[in-house]
Regions:
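Short beta-strand segments enriched in hydrophobic/aromatic residues
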Residues: 1, 63-65, 97-100
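Structural motif
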Residues: 4-5, 56, 81, 90
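Residues that flank catalytic or metal-binding motifs in active/ligand-binding sites
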Residues: 3, 46, 78-80
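A short acidic/glycine-rich loop-to-helix N-cap element
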Residues: 70-74, 103-109
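Short beta-strand edge/turn micro-motifs at domain boundaries
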Residues: 77-104
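Surface-exposed, charged secondary-structure patches
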Residues: 6-7, 11, 19-71
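Non-catalytic cap/lid and distal C-terminal segments of serine-dependent acyl enzymes
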Residues: 2, 6, 27-30, 76, ...
Length: 112
């Protein structure tokens, strides 16, 4: 991760409003690490669209989440939006922004 990188999730409150939850890589581990270790987590990319210019790259990545590799059905699907920067030596993750699929917002066919 690049210094100052962020992880952001779009979540829907009980009121129906959507909001963005912002984390650092470290706070994500603090918040979710125990649950991920206890329940397992395996995410698979099923589709990707990437665009870049100069030192920046954007990847729109459709995912399926399972507790283990052996699980037949995913417990969640959604889209991750990755923003990356190349410093001339390597690519750095600047941000990851995601939204899980829901009944009111199915993933469009073009991203499957």
């Amino acid at each position: 991760f690049a210094p100052g990188a962020t992880l952001s999730a779009v979540v829907q409150a009980e009121s129906g409003e959507f909001r963005r939850v912002i984390m650092t890589p470290e706070s994500y581990v603090e918040q979710s690490g125990r649950s991920l270790e206890a329940n397992g987590f395996h995410e698979v990319e099923i589709h990707r669209v990437s665009e870049g210019y100069g030192q920046i790259l954007h990847a729109f990545s459709t995912y399926e989440s399972r507790n283990t590799r052996q699980d037949v059905e995913p417990f969640a699907r959604g889209i991750n939006s990755f923003q990356l920067m190349n410093d001339g030596e390597r690519w750095w993750v600047v941000s990851i922004y995601w939204q899980a699929e829901g009944s009111a917002n199915p993933i469009p066919e073009k991203y499957l």
